[in-house]
From Swiss-Prot:
Keyword presence, Ion transport: no
NCBIfam families: aroB
Chain sites annotated for binding Zn(2+): E191, H254, H276
Keywords on record: Amino-acid biosynthesis, Aromatic amino acid biosynthesis, Cobalt, Cytoplasm, Lyase, Metal-binding, NAD, Nucleotide-binding, Zinc
Pfam families, per the entry: DHQ_synthase, DHQS_C
Domain of life of the source: Bacteria
Protein name: 3-dehydroquinate synthase
Organism placement in taxonomy: Bacteria, Pseudomonadati, Pseudomonadota, Gammaproteobacteria, Lysobacterales
PANTHER family: 3-DEHYDROQUINATE SYNTHASE (PTHR43622), 3-DEHYDROQUINATE SYNTHASE, CHLOROPLASTIC (PTHR43622:SF7)
GO terms for biological process, alphabetical: amino acid biosynthetic process; aromatic amino acid family biosynthetic process; chorismate biosynthetic process
Molecular function in Gene Ontology: 3-dehydroquinate synthase activity; metal ion binding; nucleotide binding
Amino acid sequence: MTTPTPLRSVTVNTPPPYTIAIGPGLLHDPPRLAATIRGRHALILSDSEVAPRYAAQLHETLLRARPDLHLNVFTLPAGETSKSLENFGAAIAQLATLGATRDACLFALGGGVIGDLAGFTAACWMRGIDYVQVPTTLLAMVDSSVGGKTAVDIPQGKNMVGAFHPPRAVIADTDTLATLPLRELRAGLSEVIKYGAIRDPVFFHWLQTTREALLARDPAALAQAIARSCEHKADIVGRDPLEKGERVLLNLGHTFGHAIETTQGYSTPGSNNLNHGEAVAVGMVLAARLSNTLGLAPAEDTETLKNLLDAYGLPTVLPSGLTPEMLLERMRLDKKNIAGRLRLVLWRGIGHAEAVPDVDEAAVRQILAN
């Protein structure tokens, strides 16, 4: 008989604190879901891939516990291109039509795109209402749903318009990972690997030895990977909720990755363009190679990281057609930069990341060219 996967809980000690619940069957838990709602209005925001699978279940569960609830569902097309100012306006209009008051709650049912857009919408409606992250992708469970960063994209760059607005709760039903496409599972594992790379060599080694179980979606292995990743993010975010210090280390590979995404065009269902997790995988290898070039990290650790990403089926080289100057143009707009100079998260080897100010563009250009 299969042993049930236990429910795991991680607390994020930001002001205000909130809990990440991780486990199977959480979309069927009326008391847990309803406990997050303070008022009588709620909106479920989802996308065209996730809503047909899970929106009706979430809707039913909420109404079972709160039959008095005024509850609507708003569905957007799947893909990064939906994280736009136009759709932000559409979500605001949905709240207005619902008659949402300041004690309303918005449920973000989907991946990182939906979570970011829903969070930003919640941050702005009546200067801030509650929202609950209900992530259905591995990447959202381990990264974007935790920490309160909310944003939309503009043509000049990714996540350029946003706010810090912590969720009221994160409810990660791991049963939803059963329907996740393999490519999206791998994208989430890229962010999981990042946690080992920046601060946990033991976890990094565990990921080396547990690859087959994770790719086979073993429930216990996935629950452990999600919980450990969330513990790392909660630990950092609890001390640095507004990214004034160490939280920036969570961005290993992201400056390169965001530049890749915005230069090539955002990935959409069926697209060959790199998705976020894939772009971060390439970005981590580029950051590691740059660290080696600058004398910060041993070359063998870079090779170990590249080999692990390769083993998980993730890309580790730049897509063709992206020139160094095209990417640098995007990197110069990165939010982490100071006084117009590149500030990158690099590393000193497995488990040790650091933010490096005033990085020489010539060194970056050389890495991008090779």
